[in-house]
Curated annotation (Swiss-Prot):
Belongs to the GOSR1 family. GO terms for molecular function: SNAP receptor activity. It comes from Bos taurus. This is Golgi SNAP receptor complex member 1. Residues 41-51 have a biased composition (Basic and acidic residues). The chain crosses the membrane at residues 230-250. The modification Phosphoserine is found at residue 141. Keywords: Acetylation, Coiled coil, ER-Golgi transport, Golgi apparatus, Membrane, Phosphoprotein, Protein transport, Transmembrane, Transmembrane helix, Transport. Its main location: Golgi. Component of several multiprotein Golgi SNARE complexes. Identified in a SNARE complex with BET1, STX5 and YKT6, in a SNARE complex with BET1L, STX5 and YKT6, in a SNARE complex with STX5, GOSR2, SEC22B and BET1, and in complex with STX5 and COG3. Interacts with GABARAPL2. It is found in: Golgi apparatus membrane. GO terms for cellular component: cis-Golgi network; Golgi medial cisterna; Golgi membrane; SNARE complex. It is a single-pass type IV membrane protein. The modification N-acetylalanine is found at residue 2.
Length: 250
């Protein structure tokens, strides 16, 4: 009976790790899609400065469809991983050996933390993509209004020239913000790839920590230092972003 329940737990852990690996790859591709959409929007804006054609890029709709498809796939994977975590929670609540139950709870909490990180990263990337798309649609509408006004009143109209200059200034500021976002997303992708390598190492270290209390104490100190380094890195990135925004709107 004990062997059967142990096999059930290991099967759940195997399914959880497989879904986590799939989600990690999907989220990296999802982030790259958002970055490429941002770059294509910036190139489209620069092209519109020298052309009166206001027709959107053909690959915009293709990227939108790809975005919707990938978002649905990631949501389904998150739902499946949530279900696996719920089954693991039910198993830990019914485990009979207290010492074993403590070790299982530690493993379950680690899988829950990974699920929470993936969910937060997905919603953040999705929100960034939607914001870029809405901003591009808004700017496209503004460009159409400008072209319509130019055709009705003439290019030499003073008000039109002032409006166009202000529009160019806004486009330059918007492009600088997009480049800043791209740098931040590239940094996040590098950290995501590093997290994949560290995750397997941490899993082995956690297994050793459950067996040797001294190793567990060492791992806790390492985790505290890692969190401190993450806070410092996040603070530096935040300050750099604020400085770039201040420079852009100064």
């Amino acid at each position: 009976m004990a062997a059967g329940t142990s096999n059930y737990w290991e099967d759940l852990r195997k399914q959880a790790r497989q879904l986590e690996n799939e989600l990690d790859l999907k989220l990296v591709s999802f982030s790259k899609l958002c970055t490429s959409y941002s770059h294509s929007s910036a190139r489209d804006g620069r092209r519109d400065r020298y052309s009166s054609d206001t027709t959107p890029l053909l690959n915009g709709s293709s990227q939108d469809r790809m975005f919707e498809t990938m978002a649905i796939e990631i949501e389904q994977l998150l739902a499946r991983l949530t279900g696996i975590n719920d089954k693991m929670a039910e198993y830990t609540s019914s485990a009979g050996v207290p010492s074993l139950n403590a070790a299982l709870m530690h493993t379950l909490q680690r899988h829950r933390d990974i699920l929470q990180d993936y969910t937060h990263e997905f919603h953040k990337t999705k929100a960034n993509f939607v914001a870029i798309r809405e901003r591009e649609n808004l700017m496209g509408s503004v460009r159409k209004d400008i072209e319509s006004y130019k055709s009705g009143s003439g290019v030499n109209n003073r008000r039109t020239e002032l409006f166009l200059k202000e529009h160019d200034h806004l486009r330059n500021s918007d492009r600088l913000i997009e480049e800043t976002i791209s740098i931040a997303m590239a940094t996040k992708e590098n950290m995501t790839s590093q997290r994949g390598m560290l995750k397997s190492i941490q899993s082995k270290m956690n297994t050793l920590a459950n067996r040797f209390p001294a190793v567990n104490s060492l791992i806790q100190r390492i985790n505290l230092r890692k969190r401190r380094d993450s806070l410092i890195l996040g603070g530096v990135i935040g300050v750099c972003t604020i400085l770039l925004l201040l420079y852009a709107f100064h």
